[in-house]
């Protein structure tokens, strides 16, 4: 029997606010344990939550970016459970009226076609703290993360393969990153994924029993975990067994999923309206104000890059993978840069430099203006492509004017035959063997000579002019 896979994803996105959702404590990552806490986070008796308006702004922004309707009378609920990293014994979340609902995004499949994935809801909530189990037999609680604002984005069960789930996460991450509401860094926990998967015989409308894969910390592990779970569930059903509703985790070492616990239902959490927070009215003017702050998203930018600038689909995807690079590209074009040349540099030397340094484009000194200036120096023959690589590294580290650096460092390309001919003659005199080889019919000896010429000029000889002059001088031998 063949089975159809059914996948839905729950994505927790940490919102990039300065303070927490209900307390004034900082919401920054990487501080010493319990440094970013106050009495609200510790749930001292009598303290009350105070809503961070910026969190609602970000919630509206996410909902609009994901084509969602917005509950304009929004409230919070209590989700009751006990765990050491949750001192209140309940989490403030949203249950029946999330800030956003009935949304969708479009994903691109492997064959180049697109598919619309519906999004059921997006709700705001507070994050829990973090437990660390020490080798000394004690468990330690860090409440820095307690109260950090989250938005949980819950898809419909519209994905039919691990590859579709991967494509959905990639598209969702791009959109969220473009809004600026989160840095979506999975390695820092600001984007976390839970995956629900079931299988059913082809043609059956009713969903099968699902299992949940919890806290998957990379898109690749999401894909691998779902692929294993597809196979595991199919083997159980083919052998006459039944699937239990479980929460499982993906073991990165073995590539398998392992049982964590039997899954609870929403009734186990005894949701009820949060009595310490009012209903928040989100007026039309508020929504429009946020809508006007949204940037152009990747799909729109890619269409422009292909249609208006003549770039390939591949180039357009690479340039729009992050908003910072896309903004840099557009600023470079506004400064007079050639689209293809700027694209080539951003995908080539710039990308290699950023990877090697472990930095983003906003963390180096290169600017759209000085990159465009450098490309113009290549185009007009002032510097060679080889020298440009040296100029680029200087600009990335120090910034400033490309033209001024080239002049100050003496990197201007030598194109004057009167300057090059004496150097060529000296190269001939210093390389008698190559000259004799050339005279003997070995035309490859000319490659050695042009290499020696470039070395003698420290790479500053204009390659085209140098090659032409050298060939002419060789013909005279």
Curated annotation (Swiss-Prot):
Q: Which UniProt keywords are present, listed alphabetically? A: ATP-binding, Ligase, Nucleotide-binding, Protein biosynthesis
What is the protein's given name? Aspartyl/glutamyl-tRNA(Asn/Gln) amidotransferase subunit B
Q: Which PROSITE patterns match?
A: GATB
Catalytic activity field? L-glutamyl-tRNA(Gln) + L-glutamine + ATP + H2O = L-glutaminyl-tRNA(Gln) + L-glutamate + ADP + phosphate + H(+); L-aspartyl-tRNA(Asn) + L-glutamine + ATP + H2O = L-asparaginyl-tRNA(Asn) + L-glutamate + ADP + phosphate + 2 H(+)
Functionally, this protein is described as follows: Allows the formation of correctly charged Asn-tRNA(Asn) or Gln-tRNA(Gln) through the transamidation of misacylated Asp-tRNA(Asn) or Glu-tRNA(Gln) in organisms which lack either or both of asparaginyl-tRNA or glutaminyl-tRNA synthetases. The reaction takes place in the presence of glutamine and ATP through an activated phospho-Asp-tRNA(Asn) or phospho-Glu-tRNA(Gln).
Q: Sorted alphabetically, which PANTHER family does this protein's record hold?
A: GLUTAMYL-TRNA GLN AMIDOTRANSFERASE SUBUNIT B MITOCHONDRIAL AND PROKARYOTIC PET112-RELATED (PTHR11659), GLUTAMYL-TRNA(GLN) AMIDOTRANSFERASE SUBUNIT B, MITOCHONDRIAL (PTHR11659:SF0)
One record GO biological process = glutaminyl-tRNAGln biosynthesis via transamidation
Q: Tell me, how does this one assemble?
A: Heterotrimer of A, B and C subunits.
Q: Which gene encodes it?
A: gatB
Question: EC top class, in one word?
Answer: ligase
What would be one Pfam family of this protein? GatB_Yqey
This enzyme's EC code(s): 6.3.5.-
One molecular function GO term is: glutaminyl-tRNA synthase (glutamine-hydrolyzing) activity
Keyword presence, Metal-binding? no
The UniProt entry's sequence similarity note says: Belongs to the GatB/GatE family. GatB subfamily.
Q: List the NCBIfam families hit by this protein, alphabetically.
A: gatB, PRK05477.1-1, PRK05477.1-2, PRK05477.1-4
Cell membrane: is it a keyword of this entry?
A: no
Which lineage? Bacteria, Bacillati, Bacillota, Bacilli, Lactobacillales
